[in-house]
UniProtKB/Swiss-Prot annotation:
Residues 25-213 form the Reticulon domain. GO terms for biological process: negative regulation of amyloid-beta formation; vesicle-mediated transport. It is a multi-pass membrane protein. Residues 1-20 are annotated as: Disordered. This is Reticulon-3. It holds the Pfam family Reticulon. Its main location: endoplasmic reticulum. PROSITE patterns: RETICULON. It is found in: Endoplasmic reticulum membrane; Golgi apparatus membrane. The keyword Cell division does not apply. May be involved in membrane trafficking in the early secretory pathway. The chain crosses the membrane at residues 45-65, 154-174. Gene3D superfamilies: 1.20.5.2480.
Amino acid sequence: MADTSGPQSSHISSSAGEKGSGCAVQDLLYWRDVKQSGMVFGGTMVLLLSLAAFSIISVISYLVLSLLAVTISYRVYKSVLQAVQKTDEGHPFKPLLEKDIALSSDAFQKALSTSLAHVNHALKYIVRLFLVEDLVDSLKLALLMWLMTYVGAVFNGITLLILGVLLAFTAPIVYEKYKVQIDHYVSLVHSHVKSITEKIQAKLPGALKKKSE
């Protein structure tokens, strides 16, 4: 009898991995561990602010130089300390140098297959929008892009990323605190948008109306 447990167990482990990574991101954004979230938030903001002030080549160069300054200084310090104390503790980074940090083929294939599934889903949705499978959805995209032309005239990409990070690390906390009130207003907006959409669909020609429904 053929063993069919392989693909199924692989799918289950992949789903579990996605749920685990999703929970980790959620914990970061909800500040479950203040120290860890603070480090990620601070590091991301420093990187984005650096990219806003300098070119990406300069930022990468400064990051590499900073890291080398720390590791070289520590390496020289430990060597001098061993010479003064006449000890032979060996290379200070020996445990890290001996650690296996190679990326396994299974992990790479799993990440690739997961990414490919998301890319294919996004491509299919983009094709539907541009080929007007649903007229209302395509009109929503056109309206969004029209609004983005005004946003792009005021903000550049890095500024939008900075605002996005600020929102990502503050909005979940605000939502968690005022969940009932926010859900109430979101429901009102959703009902209003749905009402407008239904009015637009009612005025569409017969063929387009059927397609959008």
